[in-house]
């Protein structure tokens, strides 16, 4: 009988690792700190270079995780302590209270349609609102409501309780307490993903100051039919379609003052955004400002060529120095140096999208050594890029270095094989 394996992180990398392990007959505990699995990929409209629907790829895998007999899903939970060694890790997990009985909740949505408390929606990066009781997105797994205690009127003012009154299954439980779960596992797969670097650190671009400056993930949500505008690209300032859009690369990346690392997927993400913008608005002009364009993956160079030749996307080699706003029109004036001519130039755009760099998230409870670049230290990043400095702990996805979805999924399979060996091997 194989021993269990712990997977930390419910994004695409963690999901794939969990499925690969579970299909070998190994019991998997998949821990995700948010109310639903899915991760950043769930926020994407389409994937590059094929422009396949992101949710169409991911949601079947999310459902497969929930239904797999060998996977125990622990959402809204965090690993708080790890002791022991390879083959015999003792793990403590804190399961936070949803204040909703998961066994009773049927995900009907009546509670959050009636809730009077409105909060900026994290899934849409604050561009829309959710209620104090909510599910993160319609395809959430598990499709169970969660009460945001900090914004719930009952918890903050001791009144309301509307959700309790309207719930048809009596699932609301304001007395729910945190729960500590203790596990013994053979190995651990770290798939904790990344967070975006604060774009206001690049103050010269005016993010948060100028309404029509967006970050790439915000633009992704604008493109999505499930996003705050229903898939319509409109400006924050006047709700009008932009006539021209600038995409600026390497914001908070390859910058010695903020983050010297390349974030790997930003170049192709911006190429994708420019193509999708042209599909949504055929007459829009798209210009990508870049230092070096890195099209290293399968089909990436062809994707870049397609953007230029088929869609007429312009590529301007030169990193903008600053952005200024025209007060009346809210248009944005970009000052940059054209590195091919050496001339200082300005261009005016209706909308600017910043390709912001990323930094890893890693579980502090594991006390994993970090490399100089801030990612999890690997034993040998060239020969085996999943082995950490702690035997029995493997890392996949962006936790060990910035990478795209295909590379993350490949790593997950690698880590699953190694984790299964410590667990006792595949069982039918």
What are these regions (language model features)?
Residues 1-428:
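Residues forming the flavin
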């Amino acid at each position: 009988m194989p021993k269990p394996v712990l997977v930390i992180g419910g994004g695409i990398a963690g999901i794939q690792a969990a499925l690969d392990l579970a299909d070998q007959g190994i019991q998997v505990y998949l821990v995700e700190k948010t109310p639903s699995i899915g991760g950043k990929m769930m926020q994407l409209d389409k994937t590059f270079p094929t422009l396949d629907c992101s949710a169409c790829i991911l949601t079947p895998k999310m459902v497969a995780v929930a239904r797999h007999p060998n996977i125990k899903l622990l959402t809204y939970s965090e690993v708080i302590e790890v002791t022991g060694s390879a083959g015999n890790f003792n793990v403590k997990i804190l399961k936070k209270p949803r204040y909703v009985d998961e066994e009773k909740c049927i995900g009907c949505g009546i509670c959050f349609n009636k809730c009077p408390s409105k909060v900026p929606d994290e899934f849409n990066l604050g561009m829309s609102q959710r209620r104090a009781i909510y599910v993160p997105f319609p395809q959430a797994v598990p499709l169970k409501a969660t009460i945001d205690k900090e914004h719930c009127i009952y918890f903050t003012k001791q009144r309301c309780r509307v959700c309790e009154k309207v719930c048809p299954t009596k699932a609301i439980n304001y007395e729910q307490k945190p729960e500590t779960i203790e596990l013994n596992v053979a190995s651990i797969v770290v798939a904790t993903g990344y967070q975006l670097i604060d774009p206001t650190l690049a103050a010269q671009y005016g993010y948060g100051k100028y309404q029509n400056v967006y970050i790439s993930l915000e633009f992704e949500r604008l493109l999505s039919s499930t996003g705050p505008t229903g898939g319509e690209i409109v400006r924050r300032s006047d709700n009008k379609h932009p006539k021209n859009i600038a995409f600026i690369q390497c914001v908070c990346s390859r910058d010695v003052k903020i983050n010297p690392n390349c974030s790997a997927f930003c170049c192709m993400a911006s190429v994708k955004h420019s193509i999708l913008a042209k599909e949504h608005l055929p007459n829009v002009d798209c210009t990508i400002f870049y230092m070096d364009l890195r099209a290293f993956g399968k089909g990436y160079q062809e994707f870049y060529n397609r953007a230029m030749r088929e869609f007429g996307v312009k590529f301007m080699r030169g990193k903008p120095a600053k952005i200024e706003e025209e007060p009346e029109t809210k248009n944005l004036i970009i000052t940059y140096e054209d590195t091919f001519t050496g001339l200082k130039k300005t261009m005016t755009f209706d909308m600017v999208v910043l390709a912001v760099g990323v930094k890893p998230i890693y579980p502090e409870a594991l006390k994993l050594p970090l490399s100089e670049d801030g990612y999890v230290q690997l034993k040998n990043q060239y020969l085996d890029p999943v082995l950490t400095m702690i035997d029995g702990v493997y890392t996949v996805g962006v936790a060990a270095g910035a990478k795209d979805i295909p590379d993350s999924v490949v790593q997950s399979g690698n880590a699953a094989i190694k984790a299964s060996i410590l667990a006792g091997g595949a069982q039918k």
